[in-house]
Amino acid sequence: MSERIRKIIHVDMDCFYAAVEMRDNPNYRDIALAVGGHEKQRGVISTCNYEARKFGVRSAMPTARALQLCPHLLVVPGRMHIYKQVSLQIRAIFERYTSLIEPLSLDEAYLDVTDATACRGSATLIAESIRNDIRNELGLTASAGIAPIKFLAKVASDMNKPNGQFVIPPEKVQEVVDKLPLEKIPGVGKVSLEKLHQAGFYLCEDIKNSDYRELLRQFGRQGASLWKRSHGIDDREVVVERERKSVGVERTFSQNISTYDECWQVIEEKLYPELEKRLERASPDKSIIKQGIKVKFADFQLTTIEHIHPQLELEDFKLLLKDILKRQNGREIRLLGLSVMLKPEEQARQLSFF
């Protein structure tokens, strides 16, 4: 008996934060616009509209750099409470078509419409109808990807942006995957991509035609995952309830810092108290698995360190801080963050019985 073919849609709002600002303020519609932090406060760009992207402005770019590329760029502060409200409105539109919704962020989600009856059960028509509803009711545009597996649905949603959609039918999966650059696979970052290129891998087809054991030897678990993706395999389900996995706080400094004492003062007085508050909201019994520190140096290199610990402890961050600063090599520090990985809910419930 053949396995049932799934119908997965990935919906991705077009430059979401900036689009909301342009919708709510008509004066913003024909100018280069970004949502982000102030350049004097070492801010970064959260998102920008397509006019700004013509000049090379991108998300996560320092605001100062964005203004160098586009001097007439208007940078406005974010209104997160508004974006959350709009995200709930988008979610309500999704729920007209399916209950199998996996939000990835405020502006994107996976939908499983395999058993949906709307639009005669056509995933293509459902995606089109959802996008029309969003445009007509909310004044925003969305792009969508339709495929039988999750990672390809996400890839497809980027193929006809903005305000478009792209379908990868089951019989075309391997053909599309073969020609897919490895950087298009979700989860392949800059460092991983560089290592893959050094090993001679550029397309999924290169991975598909390689030796599986050699991939494992060179790239470990990522090698195994890439091998599956390159063969058009992605068994992941659309997860309706996404359990929160981590809690974190961070601070970008208006002036770089450099010493252990400066870092510890920020941790003790600012970051740790805020982390405690957030952990209390996310996990009242404060059950965790790991705690860690993140540092971004002045050259924008990011490094993290963590260790296993069942409870949040301020003193444990001292050793982590000493260890992570061994990687400093004379560089100043631009950003400092703390995080904890939460214990899975089921595991926490089981432990509470004893």
From Swiss-Prot:
Annotated cofactor note: Binds 2 magnesium ions per subunit.
Cofactor: Mg(2+)
Enzyme class: transferase
CDD domains: PolY_Pol_IV_kappa
GO cellular component: cytosol
Catalytic activity: DNA(n) + a 2'-deoxyribonucleoside 5'-triphosphate = DNA(n+1) + diphosphate
Molecular function (Gene Ontology), one example: damaged DNA binding
List of catalytic residues: 108
Localization per record: Cytoplasm
Enzyme Commission designation: 2.7.7.7
GO biological process: DNA-templated DNA replication; error-prone translesion synthesis; SOS response
Pfam family, one: IMS
Sequence positions that bind Mg(2+): 12, 107
Site positions for Substrate discrimination: 17
Domain UmuC: 8-189
Family designation: Belongs to the DNA polymerase type-Y family.
Subunit text: Monomer.
Protein name: DNA polymerase IV
Organism (species): Vibrio parahaemolyticus serotype O3:K6 (strain RIMD 2210633)
